[in-house]
Regions:
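Formylglycine-dependent sulfatase
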Residues: 2, 15-409, 413-414, 422-442, ...
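Sec-dependent N-terminal signal peptides
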Residues: 3-12
């Protein structure tokens, strides 16, 4: 009898160990990707105007990264990096629409042609997870083609090529494809969340990948009268004071709370939750000081974004990491969690699973490549490099405390120490020539390795002294 008890106990322990191993290897994954949310646009990251109690709660349950980056400074390329696990030169998506943005007489060189749709033969993060037995669903902005169901998603609500919901599109009747109107006046963020919750309930018995790329808080800004009035009465500060935008953030936060409540109600403890933004915020809407510039710029305001990761039993609650990460890191991280090896594709980024478990990863450089033009919003507000463009063709390397910008038009260099100058105001290119040389060598080596295209052909229509009419003083 005693021998039988030992056998039974051993079997139970073995089963429990196997179940634990299986549980950790196949967590549910929820990736919340807010559109155009700036680094400073939540209470968690220092805002005193926007109210985000549920995002605070998520941070208290998990790990907050203070040096997180999007892999590109605007919507489509950042999303392509996340979904493909590859940096921009590999998938060729550098911006939204055409690459020759701005007035042609202000562009000194001819930019590299932009790719607008993620190639069907690129094995996406959803396809990789499907191969591992996951049910996959996306609820919101896709922006990489007409239908994410052709690229690994079993369920798609609201995802198409649209970059924003259009005029009055945050309330039903909707302007976007792949969503059916319910009652008039329904809020799009609310609807996407309810669809996501239905997906969770339906697939709670199997591992699921829930991609929740809200259209909010992208323009056109829109909220309820009640929320707008609330934040008008609250008032803000010179940097954050847009009541409608604040209402949109509160709506996103409330809906994140509903997701967290559902996970708790269903006791889905083995759920990895990521909260982030696709790029920096639009400076005319919300400043990210001390960061310089905003969406579309490769200064910190355009690429530094919030990251919060929660995973019960794995990620230690209420912790902070200063390790730099990017959205390129999640594809290899999910592969690492699932022990996926032979994927038959190159994946950039680094697994951050050791960080989630309280360990460290090796130091590495981060690279950004933007061989095209992106016109300015409003130079008086953009806080950019020149009046005509948010950024001109160039590359960036971040290596430890150091950040180097190289611009292709004139081979101009900017060097900043982010530890002492997070706002990128003090160009140290003449002070540290040895650091410039070392970083340029790394940057050029990376571009060669990844086969990054560099524009060199001069634009015959360029006029050095030309000033577009809207920039001329009246």
């Amino acid at each position: 009898m005693k021998y039988l008890y030992v056998l039974l106990l051993g079997g139970l322990l073995s089963c429990n160990a196997q179940n634990l191993e299986k549980s950790e290897s196949k967590p549910n994954i929820i990736y919340i990707n807010v559109d155009d949310l700036g680094w400073m646009d939540t209470e968690t990251y220092g805002s005193t105007f926007y109210e985000t109690p549920n995002i605070n709660k998520l941070a208290e349950s998990g790990l907050k990264f203070t040096n997180g980056y999007a892999s590109a400074a605007n919507c489509a390329p950042s999303r392509a990096c996340l979904i493909s696990g590859q940096n921009t030169p590999r998938h060729g998506i550098y911006t939204v629409s055409n690459s020759d943005r701005g007035n042609e007489k202000t562009r000194k060189i001819i930019p590299i042609k932009n790719t607008e749709i993620l190639a069907d033969n690129n094995i996406t993060i959803a396809e990789m997870l499907k191969q591992e037995g996951y049910i996959t669903g996306t609820f919101g902005k896709w922006h990489l083609g007409e239908d994410p169901k052709t690229q690994g998603f079993d369920v798609n609500v609201g995802g198409a090529k649209h970059g924003n919901p259009g005029k009055d599109g945050f309330f039903s009747p909707y302007n976007i494809k792949n969503i059916v109107d319910n009652k008039k006046g329904e809020n799009l963020t609310d609807r996407l969340t309810q669809e996501a919750i239905s997906f969770i309930k339906e697939h709670k018995e199997k591992p699921f990948f829930l991609y929740l790329p809200y259209y909010a808080v992208h323009t056109p800004l829109s909220t309820t009268n009640a929320l707008e009035q609330k934040y008008k009465e609250k008032g803000g500060n010179p940097f954050q004071n847009k009541a409608v935008y604040a209402g949109m953030i509160e709506t996103v936060d409330r809906n994140i709370g509903l997701i967290l409540d559902e996970i708790k109600a269903l006791n889905l403890k083995n759920t990895l939750i990521v909260f982030t933004s696709d790029n920096g915020g639009i400076r005319a809407i919300s400043h990210q000081d001390p960061l310089r510039a905003g969406k579309g710029s490769y200064y910190e305001g355009g690429i530094r974004v919030p990251y919060i990761i929660s995973w019960d039993g794995v990620v230690k609650p209420n912790t902070v990491s200063k390790t730099p990460i990017t959205n390129l890191d999640f594809y290899p991280t999910f592969m690492d969690i699932l022990n996926v090896e032979n994927l038959n594709k190159i994946v950039d980024g680094t697994s951050i699973l050791p960080i989630l478990k309280g360990k460290t990863i090796n130091d590495r450089s981060l690279f950004f490549h933007f061989p095209i033009y992106l016109q300015a919003y409003n130079f008086k507000i953009d806080d950019g490099r020149d009046p005509f463009f948010r950024t001109r063709p160039g590359s960036v390397i971040i290596d430890g405390d150091w950040k180097l910008h190289q611009y292709f038009e004139n081979n101009e260099i900017e060097l900043y120490n982010l530890k002492t100058d997070l706002g990128e105001r003090n160009n140290l290119v003449d002070v540290h020539p040895e650091k410039v040389a070392a970083l340029l060598k790394k940057l050029k080596s990376w571009r060669t390795e990844i086969n990054a295209p560099i524009p060199t052909e001069l634009n015959p229509k360029y006029e050095a002294n030309f000033v577009p009419k809207k920039f001329k003083k009246k």
